């Protein structure tokens, strides 16, 4: 609605306002039956709890690849941070598909950057690390363990001792039924954080699943050997 959009543009974070709109700024002469009658004046009560200014993101994305690479790195990092914050909000609202898309958008902006110095590459990797971690956990929520593992491993390429990445890779391996690999990741994570409850609980779960699998394999091989001996008599 035109009136509400105009009103919101006048407000600040935390502000509470009431707007009374004439029909032409609300639902017009037709109204919105059956709830809103024709030519109705509308009273809105609005409070701005928080907002995200995406203006600089839109401006940056509209640039050509050459123009983006010419932009100072601090500005790029600001744009990436804004996109990441939006992704975090969506994640916290359990809107995982949208969160994934925002994280991937931020990641693409960083990956496409042409870095000419080691210092700049380090800053880009530092910004990529939380995005890879966020993508990994988001893919776990979306039940895509292969993709969760992909991004977890990308995070480990930047920081091989990152416990969040090790934990998420361990969880992805568990969901894929690759218990030995899961155990290896979680043991490495446990070595860094021996008293972390999430790591210890998941490691315990993996150990139980791994033992059950080995026991079943042992029983199967025992039965196969028994059947083979029977055929040879």
Give the residues covered by each predicted segment:
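A beta-strand/beta-hairpin structural motif
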Residues: 1-39
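Alpha-helical segment of the N-proximal tetratricopeptide repeat
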Residues: 73, 78-111
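Alpha-helical adaptor scaffolds
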Residues: 96-165
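Intrinsically disordered, low-complexity, charge-biased linker/tail regions
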Residues: 204-207, 211-233
């Amino acid at each position: 609605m035109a009136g509400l959009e105009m009103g919101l543009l006048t407000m600040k974070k935390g502000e509470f306002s009431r707007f009374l709109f004439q029909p032409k700024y609300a639902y017009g002469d037709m109204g919105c039956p059956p709830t809103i009658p024709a030519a109705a004046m509308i009273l809105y009560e609005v409070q701005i709890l928080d907002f995200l200014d995406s203006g600089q993101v839109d401006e940056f994305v509209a640039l050509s690849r050459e123009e983006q690479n010419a932009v100072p790195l601090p500005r790029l990092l600001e744009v990436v941070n804004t996109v990441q914050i939006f992704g975090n909000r969506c994640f916290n609202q359990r809107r995982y598909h949208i969160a994934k898309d925002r994280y991937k958008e931020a990641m693409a902006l960083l990956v496409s950057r042409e870095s000419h110095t080691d210092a700049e590459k380090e800053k880009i990797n530092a910004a990529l690390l939380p995005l890879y971690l966020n993508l990994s956990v988001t893919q776990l929520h979306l039940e895509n363990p292969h993709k969760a593992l992909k991004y977890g491993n990308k995070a480990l390429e930047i920081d091989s001792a990152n416990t969040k990445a090790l934990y998420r890779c361990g969880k992805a391996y568990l969901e894929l039924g690759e218990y030995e690999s899961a155990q290896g990741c979680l043991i490495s994570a446990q070595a860094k954080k021996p008293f972390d409850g999430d790591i210890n609980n998941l490691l315990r779960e993996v150990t139980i699943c791994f033992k059950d699998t080995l026991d079943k394999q042992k029983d199967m091989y025992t039965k196969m050997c028994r059947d083979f001996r029977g055929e040879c008599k």
